[in-house]
Amino acid sequence: MRINGVLNKAAWALVMTAGAASTQAAQKVCVFDILGASGDAFNMAKDYGLAMQKQGVTLELKAYTNEGVATEDFRAGQCDALLASAFRTRQFNTVSGAIDTLGSTTMIKNGKIDMAASYDVVRKVIQTYASPQAAKLMVQGNYEIGGIFPFGAAYPVINDRSITTVEALAGKKIAAFDHDKAQALMIQRVGGQPVSADISNFAAKFNNGSVDMIAAPSLAYKPLELQKGIGAKGGIARFPIMILTYQLVLNQAKFPAGFGEKSRNHWLGEFDRAMSMIKNADAGIPAAAWIDLPPENAQKYNLMLRESRLDIASKGIYDAQGLKVIKKVRCSMNAADAECTTKSEEG
């Protein structure tokens, strides 16, 4: 009886210890999605959680509709990882954050913007960062990038179709995110008026007429009801200011060694799924809402974005190492481009 009692106590202690270990093993992930737990990003995060469970890591997801709050909760240690737009995650890793920079992934072929090739630049950069050779670049301080996926091109969304040239932007009010200094600099460069905004209110400012233009991906069109701001006179210019990404940041100390690489490879495998979402969103915008720029203007404006990108990088806002990686990918795909004979973005 006594032996049985001791064994029972020992077994109970093991159960309690295992229970405590499993409780400790659950890592919290702050997930920003404008639609909360019903959105595409959160659904992708749920599948990520299931995949990582097979790797021995249990994740507990928390949905946020306010990206700023999600980021601050992560900073404060209330979450062990953060899934959000690169505008927010750039503060934790400037190298991967360089993907979301003015025109950095845009490809011009035969004088026209080639969107398929542009997304291929993003794919190749994500592949590069998922490789073991680039693992060191994905770590800055206590933080590690655990994955990247595309969220679509940021297109100019305007309330008046006469604003289809850079010259016409002079004096126009344009939303600029407070947490991305490059936006205000670019707006000032073209003579526009930057209006302070963030991801939680920029669409409302456009829809109520407080600003004349915003930059947004097609995935935002329906959820943010951008047709209200576009009205009968506005539209969406089919010109990518940049290709946006979502990025996962890990508090490295909270995850087992080697987890970051497994995590990055999972998200690399989600690239095509993300592209399907983007293509569906593009197709869901009424044909009449799109504005096609003349090819010569698109090429001219992309060169302007490049000049702005170089200027902003010289101010230390964009990461030189990250831009170097992206240029290398661009030039591997189109070595004939004039920029590939220059030393710019190679510092």
Label the model's feature ranges.
Residues 49-59:
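Signal peptide-proximal N-terminal region
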Residues 64-104, 157-161, 214, 218-230:
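Pocket-flanking alpha-helical
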Residues 19-26:
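Sec/Tat signal peptide C-region and signal peptidase I cleavage site
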Residues 26-47:
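Extracytoplasmic "Venus flytrap"
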Residues 60-72, 178-181, 193-208:
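Short helix-initiation/N-cap motifs at beta->coil->alpha
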Residues 50, 75, 87-173, 179, ...:
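Contiguous mixed-secondary-structure segments that line small-molecule binding/active-site clefts
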Residues 222-239, 245-251:
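A beta-strand-loop signature enriched in Asp, Gly, Thr, and Trp
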Residues 1-12:
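Bacterial N-terminal signal peptides that target proteins for export
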